[in-house]
């Protein structure tokens, strides 16, 4: 299984930019995304672990370009699965709004049999040992889900999620969820590895108290630099 995350397609930076530099950034991000998809061709299943797009609603031109690239991947990789996991950019406080990610996920799932969607507040277990956890609407719901996933985990399992790790500033911010060191320790003591998207800087952490044969916390970082 190959994991990419935080691609932030349709990124739009205003401060200190010009129309041309914004267009250049847009083209760069899509070119890099295309390269990432090419690398994964016919290699393995692909997980996009949140924040496919930079915003809740994106420019239709960018949506169509993302659709073109993803449909090509799904058609060419018919024996592999594309897992689309919702991130924090894919939800809104208004329940009647549908995000660009949700539209993309629904269209691709309806068109291809090898697409699976893990929407807001949802989880899915792949291959029996990989637990995918999407963004949740608030920290309380997220904590409840983590507790349930912990019960289901066995040694050697992986939990893929879109959240901060041990970030005190995010603990009370529902738009940016947090896994505390204490929560992570319960997983690593069981020999489970947590793989985080959302944080843009890569790092590997071992929660204090983890046994020598325990798991770890891996923050992937984003593969296409668009911001810190």
Model-derived features: positions:
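Active-site neighborhood of phospho(di)ester-bond hydrolases with catalytic His/Asp-centered motifs
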Residues: 4-5, 45-51, 81-88, 116-120, ...
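An acidic, phosphate/nucleotide-engaging active-site surface
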Residues: 96-147
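Metal-dependent catalytic neighborhoods of phosphoester/phosphodiester hydrolases
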Residues: 15, 50-70, 86-110, 171, ...
């Amino acid at each position: 299984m190959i994991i990419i995350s935080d691609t932030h397609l349709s990124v739009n930076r205003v401060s200190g930019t010009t129309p041309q530099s914004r267009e250049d950034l847009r083209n760069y991000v899509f070119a890099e995304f295309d390269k990432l998809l090419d690398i994964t061709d016919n290699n393995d299943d692909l997980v996009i672990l949140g924040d496919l797009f930079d915003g809740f609603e994106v420019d239709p031109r960018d949506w169509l370009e993302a659709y073109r690239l993803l449909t090509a991947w799904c058609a060419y990789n018919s024996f592999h699965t594309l897992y689309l996991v919702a991130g924090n950019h894919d939800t809104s406080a208004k329940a009647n709004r549908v995000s660009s990610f949700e539209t993309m996920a629904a269209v691709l799932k309806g068109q291809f049999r090898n697409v699976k969607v893990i929407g807001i507040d949802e989880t899915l277990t792949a291959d029996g040992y990989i637990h995918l956890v999407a963004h949740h609407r608030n920290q309380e719901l997220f904590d409840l889900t983590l507790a349930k996933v912990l019960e289901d985990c066995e040694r050697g399992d992986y939990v893929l999620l879109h959240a901060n790790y041990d970030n005190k500033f995010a603990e009370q911010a529902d738009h940016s969820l947090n896994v505390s060191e204490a929560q992570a320790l319960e997983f690593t003591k069981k020999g489970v590895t947590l793989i985080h998207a959302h944080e843009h800087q890569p790092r590997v952490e071992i929660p204090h108290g983890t046994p020598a044969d325990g798991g770890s916390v891996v923050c992937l970082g984003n593969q296409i630099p668009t911001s810190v």
